Amino acid sequence: MTSLPEKDQQGEVSVSENQKKLSEEWEPYIDKLVASNRTRDERVESIQELFQKCVIEEKLPVDIFFSIFSLAFERLEEKNTLASYVIDTLWLFDTEWIKNFHEGSHDKAEKRLVSIGKGLKEFLPEEWLLSRLDCKFLENINVVPNGDFLNRKIVRTNTSLLYRQKKFNLLREESEGFSHLMINFFDALTCLRNKSLNEDYLIVQVNKSIISTIGAFDLDPNKVLDLILLLFSENLLDSWRFFLSILRNSPWGPNKERKFWNQLPDREKETFLNNLSNANGIFNFDERFTNTKSIMSQVLGHNLQYMYKEDDENLESYFMMVALLIKYNFISIDNIWAHLSPSDEELGKELGKYKDKLDEQTFKAKGNALTMAAPLPDDEIEDGETMDGQKAEAVPEIKKAKPSQKLGLLKSLLSIGDLSSSLLILGRYPFLLRAYPELSNLYHKLLHISISSIYANYSPLKLLPNDVRERLKQPKFIPEDSRLREITLRPPKEKNLVFSLDPFADRFNKTESEVFYYFENYDEDIPILRNLTEFYNIAIPWLRLSGLALCHDPVIVTKLCRIGQKCVDNSSESRTLWLDIIRSLLLPLITLIDVNTGLSYELFELLSKFDSSTRYALYGEWSSTSMKKFPELKLQNSITEKETKGILRRLTKTNVKQFGRLLAKVCHSNPCTVFSIALNQIETYDNLVEVVVDSARFITALDFDALTFIILSSFSNEFKKRLKSDGTSIAHWLQGLASFCGRVFRRYSSLDCTSIVEYVIKQFKVNQMFDLVILKELLSQMTGLQPWTNLSDNQIQGAAGGPVLRQLSLSLIYENPDVVRKSSMRLFNTLQKNGLATQLLVLLSQKYSTCIYDVTDENSHLKLISSLQDECSDVLYLLMEFLNMVCSPKSYYKLIPSFEQLIQDFHIQPQVAFYLSRYKNLDHSLTGSNTEDAMDIDYENTSSPNTASNPVWSIDNSVITELLPKQIWDYFSPNFYLTFWKLSLYDVFVPLERYEFERSRAFDQIRQTDAANTFYSRHRHDRQKIMQLSNSLQNELKEHINSLESVRKVLQGDCVKWFIPNGVFPNGTRLEHARFNCARYLWTLCIAPRLKMSPHDALYCAKFVKLLHSLGTPNFSTMSFLEILFNSQLPSFIFSMTQREADNFGRFLYEVLYDITSWYRDKILYERECLANGALPGFRLYWSDEQNDPDLSAVLPYNKFVLLFSKWHKYLTSYFESCLLSTEYMHIYNSVIILEKILPCFPLIIESGSALKRAAERLKDEEKREDLKVLALGYFAKLSKKQPEWVSFNSFSGTVRPSNSEKLQRPQQLSVAATSAVDSKTASISEEQAKIDKQKVALNPSAPEFVPDSTPSDAVASETDNKNLVENKAVEKRVEARSSANERKQEERRRKTTPEGNRRALRTRTPTNEDIQRSDSKLREDQSRDRTPQSRSFTNENNDNLRSVSRHTRREPQQAQNLNARREHESQKSDRWRQNGNVNRNPRVSNNNSTNVSRERSSEANHRTSNDNKRDEVTEGKDKNKRQDISGESNSRQNNAISRAGRSNGSNRGNDSRDADGRRSTHYASNKRPRSSDSQSPSNLREEDERENSRRRARQDDRRDRDSRQQRDRPRDRTSRSAREEKRRKIQ
């Protein structure tokens, strides 16, 4: 380039002159041109502006224009730059602006431009003007003489340079030269494969031949390179190293050799990893990625573009070659990337296409009503054509999209291990790994190599010895010939390698010898990470780049989980990092991975390093946010929902194993979705609970943990209402979900219920008590216990026994004891480990008193509040029973705070605090047999129950005295208050028959075990366990009896100072109504609070009141207590109770009424138990201030007691009638519950029953509330059934003799126990019996025997009665004629020796140890006699559960007993006919078989001969004296209880008893208080029968005459017998 011409002197003068002409207006433009800080664009813009003002706008004169540029060229040092800008501007104005924008003034502007050019050409180089400006413009400014000639010269020169061929680039132009080149390459490849020549020598010779051939035949080097690359791609598999060496030594070789990772020294590796770690895994792309354009890249790009246009699909080997050239630094990726198709814009659209594809699949995966329904039938015409008769249009064939060359190159780069180049592409298009699984698999293959060193430190193989690991790496030996019997193993043969382009040929090969051609070198350039820092900074970003594509490689996910298990520590950074990995990678990945239980367990091992709240937060994000964020998860979630709903529709109890596995298979990948759907259906359909619980046995630990989270989420859902629409009960969904929760936590030990308990505790703390049902179901299901309301009467009675009987009674007999035991211990360990037991105890105790006040106004329905209180009571009971069952004494004491802490620190009510403290001393409240236990007391050295030897009850008196007002202690002592609350039912009651029943059941199980065909060892083991149980029951019964006697002995001495301990003048002033107030305070402060706690406590209160009376407690008035019980406060008391409390009060009231009714029916019993010749002060009328002296004149006589009892009935009728007629819900509901409980004892009077019946009828007819209406309907039916047993008030009270209309409303019914066969000797008796059976009539409950002090001579019989009596008398005479005295004696002896006789005798007195031993020996004799095959009538079921009870009716196995029963039946038939109108005295009797059997047993001693009567009197006197000697007055309570229990076979519940699950037992009676017609003890029955026999013989003749006279005076009942029977059936 020539420099600018120098200016002459004249020019300088002209310039200076022009400079003077410049004004200040144009001076800034000069500054813009010459300023050094001006950019290129700013200078060009200033030049164009000056040209426009001068040429176009004519605002700048030409001379001033020249002056501006002259000064600019003078001042500017870089004149060439300004000259270049001016020349470009001249070209622009000449070719574009003047011609296109100024057509009107074109000539003027062109002239001005020419003049400017002529003036400026002196400052511009001529060469630049000739090369840039148009030829015509150059001619105009006088640079060239002829512009056309210059233009022709330029054309000729370009033609010569561009179109004259010097080298041959077509095969047809120089075929010989190209053929020679190809032959040289083929010969070299042949030598290389045959290994005939050295490879290095071949490479040198081939390169020489290439150069010589190009020079000799004038070949185009680019064409030669193209041919070499084509040969390279075709011979890639076995000759890639050869071609790379040829190209490396050729002129097209790389400028710089690249060092791979395995070639770097350790120092460079460390530096590289540090730089890579600091850059978070981002490579520092050096010049090899940004090389200038090379010939090789242009040749490759041209070929690739041609192949894309021609749809050449066989490009895999070509892409592999390009990838090798990139890896070995021949070309850079940016040089080749621009030549690949499709464009970057189209490649970026792949993400949108991928998401649209997933959305479409998601839409199709969603099930709807139409797709889930059955297919519809096709509507076709007869000829098979469609309805419209038209053929379906042909679907146009979709043109297959061309394969992406960029994806092919990326796949090849990943295949050969070029990680750095691959990351350059993946960093820009990371979604490619998610959209194309083959790319992600190749990428993960490289990551495996990178983290291999780190994973080796945490692999399970590291735990193995080195020699074992080495043996695992050795190839497995294979058999030489599998057809031979004796197989000889040999090492496998070496494989003949066959190279393939498939990177996974070694994994998915069709033949054993196929391998990837580059398998030896693909890992040579992958950095190997060494420590966790590099893993976090490098590997984790690489894994995040793959993202959800990791689902295609579960192995790398497993490795990641195992590394995390070892690396998660207590540091916050580590935990935060792994939480982010779990949240963003692992949990979403588990949804997309196919069923992989191993991976599920590995992930849960990592999750278990975090607490439950953190895990549940992760599950919540996983199930909600992640499912909506990623389209892959959204699709998988839709598929899971559809599959889950389909499985649940088909899941039943019969196919749980099949469909449960399918449900678990779906659950492994997406447990939150599966369980959410399952729980939603469980909340609606209860029948799914059991089948879903069964199907959960196939799921993993992660699934169980997610299930707990889903349960908690469902419980805590604020949008679900916890009450039904009526607001009176718990919602159905909450009840069903709580039931499922309890069952599933009991069934599976993998589930941890800590979170559920913690949730319930938090709910309690915020006064959300509706979740009590959750804790109730959890405790009930996991412990096998049931609330008091779900227990039968037998279970409640059995709970009063020792630990063994208590556990047998309270446990669910149909539960597997091993399952319950394991689940109980799991629950206890959970509560103890997390300190939740004490929290629950205290919270429940507090909420027991405050839960009714925690409800809101909108939930204040009385029924809801009542049920809430009952639920709290049930849960507290279950928790206490559970802790008492599984805790050791020491741990149990630690769990329960002391009494002082409960009262003072936790502000718990006294009755609840005593309730908790009693459980500390449950087994032995006052006595004990194990002196090592902290609860035991030595009674020989103890005079008071409250002594320091019992640490549990060593409560400071100041604590007790502060519980009640000070004036209360003037009426009873703190010692009594503490004694009452500390004692339990165990201390005052022995469930004798429950012990007998359980031991009898144990012997039945022994017989079943003997009969079962089991192995000897199993049989011996089972028999030993059952015998151990029987012996435990026997020992426990002995201990219980001894404990009862000891307790009574202690209380007998302590009761002296219980009431009015300081006398009636404690402070010098007399106490007003002292004994009445004692009874009142006893009721309000002791009895009333405790009886509401539980059925056990209700029974205890009744027994305790009876105990106070029987002990002759000074200053205690039983009559005053009963007056307070039946006074006007009863309706208010009923209203204030909940439903369960009303049930408990009903039990208490029944026990009290039963005892009072027994005294009412038997004057002798009343005098013995209530008066005791004045020794018992309970019914004293007059009291002395000094001492309670025995004085019969001061006690209540029997006739006045009858009037008092009648008055109480009248009061009760009035109170309950007012409650039934009330509109208050609690009045009605509670009163009906109580009335049903006391129905056997109340009402007994016609007036009372009629009033209550009318009230119940009105209630069932007019009540709109369904629950009350159902209750009233049930009570009305039961009351109607009892109506025939009622008597009039006059008859009941004995004030006025009954009128004719009240006498014998129905004839006497004579029933006979059914038997199967009769002895031949009694055939004639059977014939007479058949005649009498046709005349069966009902009992007459209004007989005069109900009237106290009345005699049978006062009774009046109806006409039908007279007829029956005459027939009965005739039958009696015939029976006496046929039955001899010897037969009766033999029958009596036989009856006494039967087991039933022994049991009946046992019930009539206090059991002793000798009685128990005799009973044991008798049971063993029965057992040994029943072992014969002929006597086995029981099933051969082998029951491993010692506490389970057979659900089938137990049958008597002995044929001898059947014969004895038939003989006894004959004797009883003959005895019954001697009654002649003897009416039962029990108003509770019902016309059923149990009543008849009871009457038969009670009348056996009434109809013997005079000699037999005398013998019976002597025997009875001896037995009576013996009983009095054994028991005495102090044991009268126990005698009465046992005697009443002994008559349970005659109860209105039938001859056989039922245990907790309703199974019958003919051996022993029910432990529930009997409801039989015979309410008296056997001794009293004998005395009464003797009196009746003597009176009957004296009045036998007079009665017949009197009956006949009354029959004539009485109107005849003309109703037919069939009509009367029909009427009787309707009433019943």
UniProtKB/Swiss-Prot annotation:
| Ranges of Low complexity composition bias in the record | 1476-1493
Predominant cellular place of this UniProt entry's protein: nucleus
Where does it reside?
A: Nucleus
UniProt biased composition (Basic and acidic residues) = 1-10, 1360-1399, 1411-1429, 1461-1474, 1494-1526, 1551-1560, 1581-1628
Q: Which residues in this protein are found as Phosphothreonine?
A: 1406, 1408
Q: Which family does it belong to?
A: Belongs to the THOC2 family.
Q: How is this protein named in the record?
A: THO complex subunit 2
- This protein's species is Schizosaccharomyces pombe (strain 972 / ATCC 24843) (Fission yeast)
